[in-house]
From Swiss-Prot:
Membrane topology: Multi-pass membrane protein
Protein name per the record: Potassium-transporting ATPase potassium-binding subunit
Assigned protein family: Belongs to the KdpA family.
Subcellular location: Cell inner membrane
Database matches in Pfam families: KdpA
Phylogenetic placement of the source organism: Bacteria, Pseudomonadati, Pseudomonadota, Gammaproteobacteria, Enterobacterales
Cytoplasm keyword on record: no
Record function comment: Part of the high-affinity ATP-driven potassium transport (or Kdp) system, which catalyzes the hydrolysis of ATP coupled with the electrogenic transport of potassium into the cytoplasm. This subunit binds the periplasmic potassium ions and delivers the ions to the membrane domain of KdpB through an intramembrane tunnel.
Gene this chain is encoded by: kdpA
NCBIfam families: kdpA (TIGR00680)
GO cellular component, one term: plasma membrane
Keywords: Cell inner membrane, Cell membrane, Ion transport, Membrane, Potassium, Potassium transport, Transmembrane, Transmembrane helix, Transport
Organism of derivation: Klebsiella pneumoniae (strain 342)
Subunit structure: The system is composed of three essential subunits: KdpA, KdpB and KdpC.
Residue spans crossing the bilayer: 5-25, 63-83, 131-151, 173-193, 254-274, 282-302, 327-347, 356-376, 379-399, 416-436, 483-503, 525-545
Length: 559
């Protein structure tokens, strides 16, 4: 089993890196404001039709454009969900959503979280899925990538105020990156058996003689961007465990590759844009090493089985509860780590059925800020915050002014870094405390003891860090949970973007200092170790007490 796990992980990473490298070069051209070959004329027509002036923006103007863009998208999606019952492409005549569920869902998809307090096949019309949720999957992904474009330019430029044009970046990312990749992946899914139609649900009779409805819909098109944009919201309630979303072992592999493809490519693009490819590789190494460690722990925990059953003498050498037999325990464990490392939230197994330690690792990956590959864009700008924090810590130890890529990290930057890093832990810990203190919060707990607490902690962690996966034993389809998690998703997304853009605005105006003999190397093994240590230290200090009350207490109670 260990050899199989090693081969699965090694082959996955090899294929990922082979695909990500050329895509990184393409992304670097976009960051450098170079139109892709043959598309410059098309872009000029688009700017004219849309009334876009392709002039570069300062950080505040860029930020306001991003915020306005997402606010309008959220309002449009909220209205669509409320009016769903009177709109077309609704063959099952599904009613509009309640205001609190519509608000939760709109915030969820605008913030790239895709938390779902509903079952898609019994709640959403085809119009809501296509025009509402799928469109926001593209736009929320483009938002995250646009923000990291601006931050990367801030490191590459000097003595300037401009960071690019938000409308140009959003358009290019959507039309020339996300749409082509999604089309290719969707066509592959259709070939593998994923539905793509507008038919009404099909009645059929089971082998036992029972009558059921077979859900249909435009699944493949939504499935592709759900993964490539690290969105994660499933067309069906079972998400990628459903055979219509993820029918074969081959689609499962492609789904895992799609989740990490753009985050990995952005690391390569970062190195090219700042004219030092070693910097991008160092960040990628740090992410990969943490990822490998987490995969090993989850595979080990799940292949050991349930400790309580083992002590009773039952045959429980593998924990297959909540997993699809067509994927097996290793691929399910790998998928769980990928989806929580990458802020995706799609699942091909039920995380609530993992062992205590096996479920703790995905939770912890979210709690450290979704910086191990992370969401498209958000993962890299989140890791760059930790890079600057690590540089600052190293500067304190040797008594030198901290610098990264020739840019001095001053008091202003450190305040913004601290604010951005502390936003999500504050939301997670206070949100969990509020849920545990109130009757409305505890009413959603279907399990007592440490596991019930873990379900609450996981839900708030997932929302605040814009992941969207869940320990499904929590009844979150209530006004209390809809509003609490909507607040966490909204603040967890945009209260991080705001300081990141402020940092970009400060850095782009600074001069790039030439390297001196005393300059800290930020591309070697020593710095990679320092960066990993910084990420682990912040995660450990912040969440170990909460984890001790949940998954750790559950694990030791079973021994």
């Amino acid at each position: 089993m260990a050899a199989q796990g090693f081969l699965l992980l090694a082959s996955y990473l090899l294929v990922l890196l082979v695909l990500a490298r050329p895509l990184g070069t393409c992304l670097a051209r976009m960051m450098n404001d170079i139109p892709l070959p043959g598309l410059a004329g098309v872009e000029r027509v688009l700017w004219r039709v849309a009334g876009i002036r392709a002039e570069e923006m300062g950080w505040l103007q860029y930020l306001l454009a991003i915020l306005l863009f997402n606010a309008l998208g959220g309002l449009a999606l909220f209205a669509l969900l409320m009016l769903q019952g009177v709109l077309p492409f609704n063959p099952q005549h599904l009613p509009g959503l309640s205001w609190d569920l519509a608000l939760n869902t709109a915030v969820s998809f605008v913030s790239n979280t895709n938390w779902q307090a509903y079952a898609g096949e019994s709640t959403m019309s085809y119009l809501s899925q296509m025009v509402g949720l799928t469109v926001q999957n593209f736009l929320s992904a483009a938002t995250g990538i646009a923000v990291v474009f601006a931050l990367t330019r801030a490191f590459a430029r000097q003595k300037m105020s401009a960071l690019g044009n938000a409308w140009v970046d959003l358009t290019r990312i959507t039309l020339w990156l996300l749409l082509p990749l999604s089309l290719l992946v969707a066509l592959f899914f259709i070939q593998q058996g994923v539905p793509q139609n507008l038919l009404a649900y099909q009645p059929f009779t089971t082998l036992e003689g029972a009558h059921q409805l077979l859900p249909m819909g435009p699944v493949a098109s939504q499935e592709a961007i759900k993964l490539l944009g690290t969105n994660g919201g499933g067309f069906f309630n079972a998400n990628s465990a459903h055979p219509f979303e993820n029918p074969t072992a081959l689609t499962n592999l492609v789904q895992m590759l799609a989740i990490f493809l753009i985050p990995a490519a952005l690391c390569f693009a970062f190195g090219e844009v700042v004219s030092d490819r070693r910097q991008g590789r160092a960040i990628l190494w740090a992410m990969t090493l943490i990822f490998i460690l987490c995969v090993a722990v989850v595979m080990w925990a799940e292949t050991r089985g349930n400790p309580h059953l083992l002590t009773l003498g039952a045959d429980s050498s593998l924990n297959m509860e909540g997993k699809e037999s067509r994927f097996g325990i290793l691929a399910s464990s790998l998928f769980a780590v990928i989806t929580t490392a990458a802020s995706c939230g799609a699942v091909n197994a039920m995380h609530d059925s993992f062992t205590a330690l096996g479920g703790m690792v995905p939770m912890w990956l979210m709690q450290i800020g979704e910086v191990v590959f992370g969401g498209v864009g958000s993962g890299l700008y989140g890791m760059l915050l930790f890079v600057m924090l690590a540089v600052f810590i190293a500067g304190l130890m040797v008594g030198r002014t901290p610098e990264y890529l020739g840019k001095k990290i001053d008091v202003r930057e450190m305040k913004m870094i601290a604010l951005a890093i502390l936003v999500t832990p504050t939301l997670v810990l206070l949100g969990t405390a509020l849920a545990m203190m109130t009757d409305a919060g505890r009413a959603g707990m279907f399990n007592p003891g440490p596991h019930g607490f873990s379900e609450v902690l996981y839900a708030v962690t997932s929302a605040a860090n814009n992941n969207g996966s869940a320990f499904a034993g929590l009844g979150a389809a209530t006004p209390f949970w809809n509003l609490l998690l909507a607040f966490c998703m909204l603040v967890g997304r945009f209260a991080v973007i705001i300081p990141v853009m402020a940092i970009a605005g400060s850095l782009v105006a600074k001069k790039i200092q030439p390297a001196s003999p005393g300059t800290l190397a930020t591309h070697d093994a020593l710095f990679i170790g320092l960066l990993i240590g910084t990420v682990l230290l912040v995660g450990a200090l912040t969440f170990i007490p909460a984890l001790a009350l949940g998954p750790l207490a559950e694990h030791f109670s079973l021994l």
